[in-house]
Amino acid sequence: MPDVRPGRHELGQNFLTDRSVLDRIVHLVSQRQGPLVEWGTGNGAVTLALSELGRPLEGVEIDSRRAAELRRRIGPHVCIAEGDILRHAPPQDAVVVSNVPFHLTTPILRHLLASTTWRHAVLLTQWEVARKRAGVGGTTQLTAQWWPWFTFTLDRRVPSTAFRPRPSVDGGLLLIDRRREPLLPDTDVRDFQSWVAKVFSSRGRGVAEILRRNGVPARLANQIAQRRRRSHAPVLPRDLRAEDWVEAYAAV
């Protein structure tokens, strides 16, 4: 029986071919200290660019054939491991780099944020995902749940023409950095995230009413809502910033 393997497009990843974007990724990584890990090395475009930094680099690739091909092309200071990135644990204080397969964006982000060892991440995701995770135009529940421990920054938009095969949407460079001084202790992760989920799922005419229903004193709830008001439209949970969530949670 022939050895039939899925094509890279079937695996959900679009190769990055734009040199200016590769250079930007390398620049962002160079500003962050720590061993490098690339999730999903693919054809090695990002891997080869990162290898020029001369730092310890581990690549994780699920396609055994592509992993073997890349091992033959890469320098001795780079380790290419065959494996599932959703089961990979980055080394201590690592910088995680990934051209994230679009169909795995959410599980990869959840796995990354739940990992306790890495310090920085430079991710290429779908544009709308990058915007929402960075809280541009309104944040998501996932970002709000992790904001006390991480910062999320949108670096730039990456046009769909930068990829092969060309996807139907643009990409975006998303930076996630672990806070050196968390806004809440690690022991609060579970309770805080559960409370944020309740706030996002609660009904109300605006965030002040929603916060009051979830234990926040009325005066503080009104102050937070007023702080984020930009128009006559009601302020919603997606409009809150990290400091708002922490202040409200601490008052419950």
For each feature predicted by the language model, list its residue ranges.
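C-terminal lobe and adjacent flexible extensions of AdoMet/dcAdoMet transferase-like proteins
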Residues: K198-V252
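Catalytic cores of RNA-modifying enzymes
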Residues: M1-A197, N222, R238, E243-A250
